């Protein structure tokens, strides 16, 4: 059974707290980088910021699933020391559930391993910029992991492209659900290509690719990374 990603919104009135269930994907974005290759030890650390559009599935007022777009912001810092990866999840404006945090942490580690990158000098901050909202699930994790790799390598994610899925232990894109709704949400936001797991979730209905949009099934991290950046993972 594939895992889903979602969020809930906190309220000061418990009886009025709405609950949204989301299956998130990530599509990429805006990448701002300031490389400092070969910088001496007294120079500032290398810093990048990436805002990732997130596609998901929520319930409308009639409790029917619909696609939705949110964002996650990644701040990446490459330090001069090698004291270990520091991964921090901000709690304001929104926050990440423990399960989402673990999924993201695992995906980053597996993406770095596949790319043969040492991450012991990195500090990464993740922000969910929606007041009072908590993100749940794991289907954003592959996009976050590969986005961090792209930031470390100084490679851009092509605007209008996105990925939904997890990263499995053997380095493949893991199955997630809600693909038909995610495709429609991506189309509504004028994304031109999304990458989905090659293995389909059994609960998903049949769907058709919208006009002028490309949906690409991928099964390996290298194929997913190439689809997002136009570069090889290693």
Name each model feature, range by range.
Residues 4, 27-29, 184, 208:
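Generic intrinsically disordered, low-complexity segments enriched for polar/acidic and small residues
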Residues 1-14:
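N-terminal secretory signal peptides that target proteins for export/translocation
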Residues 21-31:
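Bacterial N-terminal signal peptides
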Residues 38-234:
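Peripheral, non-AAA+ core regions of ATP-driven protein-machinery
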Residues 33-35:
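N-terminal signal peptide c-region/cleavage motif recognized by signal peptidases
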